[in-house]
C-alpha cells in the first residue's frame, strides 16, 4: 500500500510540477512515480531484498514483451490524442523501469539525484521531454562528451539486444 500512495504522491512532481511535452514521453511520469516511490519505501523495509524483487517484477516480462514481433519502444510517437491510452502497458510498466534504473547506475546515484533536482527546478510549472533530462544528466556526467544520448536512444527502440552488450538496459 505504501508504494501505491507514494507513487501517486510522486506524480505531484513528475506529471504535475513538470509535465511531459507530449504523450511521446508519458512513460516518464509513470516510471518516475514508481522509481521515486521505491526510493522512499525501501529504507522502511530493510529486510526485503529490493534488487531481487525488482528483477523478478520486471525482467521476465520486459524480455518477453520486448522480444515479440509487435513490440513497441518505450518512447512512442502519438499522432492522435484519442489513442493515448494505447501507450500504457508492459513496455511502460516493465521495460521502462529497467531503462531508468540502468541510467541511474550508469551515471551514479548522486549525479542522478542532482540531475533530477535540476530537471525539476528548470522545468517546474512547465513541460519537458526525455531528451531534456538526458541533456542535463549528460552535461553533469561527462562535461558534454555525448555518452548519454546514445544510451538514451534505447527508449526509442524496441527489440533491444539481449546479449549483455554494454549500455543495454538488460545488463
Predicted feature descriptions by range:
Residues 1-171:
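Hydrophobic alpha-helical and helix-loop surface patches within well-folded domains
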Amino acid at each position: 500500500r505504501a508504494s501505491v500512495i507514494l507513487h501517486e504522491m510522486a506524480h505531484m512532481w513528475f506529471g504535475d510540477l513538470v509535465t511531459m511535452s507530449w504523450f511521446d514521453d508519458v512513460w516518464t511520469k509513470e516510471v518516475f512515480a514508481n522509481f521515486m516511490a521505491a526510493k522512499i519505501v525501501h529504507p522502511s523495509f530493510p529486510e526485503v531484498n529490493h534488487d531481487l524483487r525488482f528483477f523478478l517484477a520486471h525482467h521476465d516480462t520486459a524480455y518477453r514483451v520486448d522480444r515479440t514481433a509487435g513490440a513497441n519502444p518505450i518512447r512512442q510517437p502519438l499522432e492522435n490524442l484519442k489513442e493515448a491510452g494505447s501507450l500504457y502497458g508492459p513496455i511502460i510498466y516493465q521495460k521502462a523501469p529497467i531503462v531508468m534504473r540502468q541510467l541511474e547506475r550508469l551515471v551514479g546515484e548522486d549525479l542522478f539525484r542532482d540531475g533530477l533536482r535540476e530537471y525539476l527546478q528548470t522545468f517546474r510549472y512547465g513541460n519537458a521531454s526525455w531528451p531534456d533530462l538526458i541533456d542535463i544528466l549528460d552535461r553533469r556526467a561527462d562535461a558534454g562528451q555525448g555518452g548519454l544520448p546514445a544510451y538514451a536512444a534505447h527508449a526509442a527502440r524496441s527489440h533491444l539486444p539481449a546479449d549483455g552488450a554494454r549500455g543495454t538496459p538488460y545488463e
